[in-house]
Amino acid sequence: MSDAAAAPPERKKRTITEIRDSKKSGEKMVYTSVPDYTSAKWAELAGVDVAVVGDSLAMVAHGHSSTVPATMDMMVMHAQAVRRGAPRTFTLGCMPYQSYNTVDRALLNATRFMQDGGCDAVKPQGGRSQAHILKALVDSGIPTASHIGLTPHTIAMFGGFKIQGRTAEAAMKILEDAFAIQDAGCFMLEFEAVPAKIATLISKQLEIPTIGIGAGAGCDGQILLSYDLLGVFTDFKPKFTKRYANLTEVAVQGLKAYVDEVKTGRFPDDDHSYGVDDREYEQFMNLVEKRRHV
């Protein structure tokens, strides 16, 4: 195994305290959304701070056009795979559409994420309108974050994927949502598709750390989907996504080479086949011949 692929020998899972304290220390926390065992393993090897089991997996892993079809059963199954792939990485489970629309439902599903999925914390979406849900989760002892700005669960109300907070009034609503999340006891919040200056100013008003996706460099940390930044998911690329690799191109080239070698008889060769002792093979041929004449 190369040095680049070797697991960090002394890596310890991040704690809630460390994540909260990153606000004061100035350490930029790195989050990435990982839908499966392999991408989670890559994230841990790379030193990512938080592996996010995002309901975006409904799109990048299941081919849906939005996150709405994600179910708790689906999310728990993927969370289990992520935990196996990244056992030493703090894991945050994103609660899917309508899985937290009542306090009882939120507590039940958040508990599933923690007990069955192996997550270290959960993240619903929403601010003031969900503050009672967030507080109930926190009060029950479940580490909880939230997500504001562009919230995929309410995308239809926004008229599609549109930047949020571009007017002073809209920006104030995001600020009030942020304070509601903090007051509910959440340890972190995520901004999505918010103008950089707005997200930066709001972040400075808060005591809890913020992470951004399409919210500029002024947030306390950043999150991108691993399938986006690695070029695995290529159906579309949001403006805020930077491609650090193009694994789809590499994968297609590899598969084309495989197809070509099988079609032309070059694969498998002796190096990729199992041998047999000559005497055993000769005996086998004799047995086959005898069977033909029975």
UniProtKB/Swiss-Prot annotation:
Binds 1 Mg(2+) ion per subunit. It comes from Methylibium petroleiphilum (strain ATCC BAA-1232 / LMG 22953 / PM1). NCBIfam families: panB, PRK00311.1. Transmembrane segments: none annotated. Catalyzes the reversible reaction in which hydroxymethyl group from 5,10-methylenetetrahydrofolate is transferred onto alpha-ketoisovalerate to form ketopantoate. This is 3-methyl-2-oxobutanoate hydroxymethyltransferase 1. Mg(2+) binds at D55. Homodecamer; pentamer of dimers. 3-methyl-2-oxobutanoate binds at D55, S56, K123. Its EC number is 2.1.2.11. One of its GO terms (molecular function) is magnesium ion binding.
